[in-house]
């Protein structure tokens, strides 16, 4: 781990070629992340994917260090969670009929405000979480280990881009040409969308997440669709429409309960320690620990001025008013701490839950139009998403000995580029497909945004939501993944089934690798090395399949917009 009081120079880490590669990758990953989040209701961390391709391209251009690759992938992945923050909140306004009240400029201001607040907050909390508390940040740690494993090069590039090409071509055949169907094995079950979604991306998500977590996801799907909708209607307890409302309410309650439980169990007990740690840091820091300017005093001024500027901008440009703007700005700093703690301990960043919490707090203090509440949730979700990404990158940098200031500057570059791209993609998608394409059982399920919309407009079944909320809290305390179960309850069954099939492929893949190693009679050291290479190959191919379909989906959306503009 790097020592912040004796950090390495930025020379050779934040480079021109790295910035160019990072920005190009950021554009692609941000666009595909927005599409993935809307289409699938989930967004896997892109850090490992970005790390692999960053090192690959840098090596094509000559010698490259792991530190340069670390900074490059920091730039490259920055926009993904900005896109996630928008995709998990803003489409809720489209579902409620407010699409014509949200412009591209509004979307960009929301993304930019969240990005800047997230950057300022992480400059403050970096030392506490990475150095003093030294949290695990499993995704960031995995990215560092992946860079080390990939350094030797080899077949990585061919595997990655070959799988991307296959998924991209397949997506064109399915979505543009209609040669292959979107759904397979469809069954007519009242109230249940039973099918296998013909999607390399969703299969890859199941593969990347792994069998055990997706098994809980699928269990939730079975409970909601066959336990409540099929079983409940067969028993005459309620009709199909009522059952579907119950399922949505239960799923939302489970996810909300999980988010609140994370705050209650893991965040609040740490807040006092975090504040004490930050205060202690401020008395002992040197300018070497500055991440923004190289001077702690100048950093303090920049953070204060930047925070005030964002409060003024959102108050005027988004018409939130002074009191809501101040509340949003202050609570965003609190929620980024929550986000960092959650990512550091669990690898999960429930950004939309944090957005919901602040949105409800603001709604209690101010009378705002519903569409404005989505702006608030979006700002907070973007800030928390970016904070999670930044802290994971900082963890990878600590493992590899990268200069954290170089990383922070890279994150600022990628975050601002990501805000531009994410806003453009969101507007392009709603223009191409129309606001009616977003929501449960629609082309873009936008599960998290649907939760936000429901919290704004009302809950179908308050008792079931309350029951799910309580169950989510209890389950988290018992170590049961309520978020995954709630996601399965909430999402259409065809998505859960397809992801489960992908996780089954991962289970078979791991068992085959173990059987092969056992038959080979390898030593423990050779077995570990071979298994690491095998796992990396699976990661690269699955990431390529996911990225290929995502990128093509965005390209098709832009083509559709272009054709509509041409008449």
Where are these regions (language model features)?
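Alpha-helical multipass membrane-protein architecture
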Residues: 1-567
